[in-house]
Amino acid sequence: MVQNMTYDELILRIIILLRDGKIRDFRSVIDELQPYDMAFIFKEMPEKHRARYLSYLTVDDITDMIGELEREFQLVVLNKVGKTKATLAMNKMDNDDLAQLLEEMDEELKEQLLSSMEASESKAVQLLMNYPADSAGRMMTNRYVWIPQHYTVKDAVVKLKSFAEIAESINYLYVINESKQLVGVLSYRDLILGEPEEKVQDLMFTRVISADALQDQEEVARLIERYDFLAIPVVEENNVLVGIVTVDDIIDVVIREADEDYEKFAASGKDITFDTKAYVAAYRRLPWLILLLFIGLISGSIISYFEDALKQVVALAFFMPMVSGMTGNTGTQSLAVVIRGLSKEEMNKKTIVRLIFREFRTSIFIGAVCSVLIAIVSIIWQGNALLGFVVASSLFLTLIIGTMSGTIIPIILHKLKVDPAIASGPLITTLNDILSLLIYFGIATAFIHSL
């Protein structure tokens, strides 16, 4: 029955069950829902029903649901369920998720919650919180299966069964020596295909791809993407195994980094969502826009400088927006290609040279097609072949310049260790506006007496 219900129907059904105190019917509904569904229902239901909704959920339900909620709602849940239930849920949460959640709390509340947790779990969480914010150590979990290299397949299976319930991932078994150094890795498939008395060290892969605990999360994401891993081991000095990073955490990193790059690319300000207040959104966007406003005044100065040319040939004004707009568009297209390549670290010297020449050839093809089209349009529209030549040649040159600026500027910034996404959309477009107007009016001035 639940499968065919919309979220609105589900919320209404749950509210009725909460009101009537029908715990058994409530459980039958909840048992058919995924953690995401429970989290969505909590966020969307009226505030007055949330406390009772949480009181009817088990600790396991709350633990699973918290993992699907945004930080602000996670804090709401922990505050509403009370200290005892919150502590039980925190003991079962993934340590990396809990470490990130506790960062949002004030020191006093953080210490209270950590002290109320099981000693082993509290120690593990505090260990993660000692790592830098965007490092592999901060996002790793200590809930994984490691096996001594002297184990047999039979011993490994016994340990795997005992740890399967609490381990975040059992796709890979990590093999260590007496010093807890990572010496190999074994897949679950290889384990079950091995003979019971066969040694793990005879089955394991010794070339292990791992991440350093202090390595940036984006670099870890690239490693997992490159090798198609479901998890990657995290090591400290001397290759000592300290945890693993799983692919679900990497997906969160990729989404977050993509959001940040898009915000920079659009110069729209950081952390702006549908719920952001208007004055906050305006405050975050204004610095870029004010900067671009003053840069844009240069375009106005250029037009003012060539005022005499405009007075003599008014038709020049008709094509001015088209020339500057097309230049900005092609620059933004090239910029998107380069930023994507840089974000995936596909750029080496050979690739950069090949990309620049490829974009140059592309701009020539695009410029040739567009300039021929606009020449035909201007001749038919204005009946002036020379005007058509001026517009077409200007467009041809500006499209080449726009494409190359969108290609070369982010590469230069990358080499200077500056985030290339900063030199994005609006800035490239504004700079290309200036260049396109200079070229357009420069060519027009050269032929002004013949026009």
UniProtKB/Swiss-Prot annotation:
Topological domain (Cytoplasmic) residues are 1-285, 333-371, 414-427
Q: What is its main location?
A: membrane
Q: Which domain of life is it from?
A: Bacteria
Tell me the compartments it is located in: Cell membrane
Residues annotated for Mg(2+) 1 binding in this entry: 64, 228
Q: What is this protein called?
A: Magnesium transporter MgtE
Kindly give the membrane topology term recorded for this protein: Multi-pass membrane protein
The reaction(s) this protein catalyses: Mg(2+)(in) = Mg(2+)(out)
Gene Ontology CC annotations of this record: plasma membrane
Instruction: State where Mg(2+) 4 binds.
Output: 228, 252
Chain positions recorded as Mg(2+) 2 binding sites: 96, 249
Detail which positions bind Mg(2+) 3. Answer: 218, 257
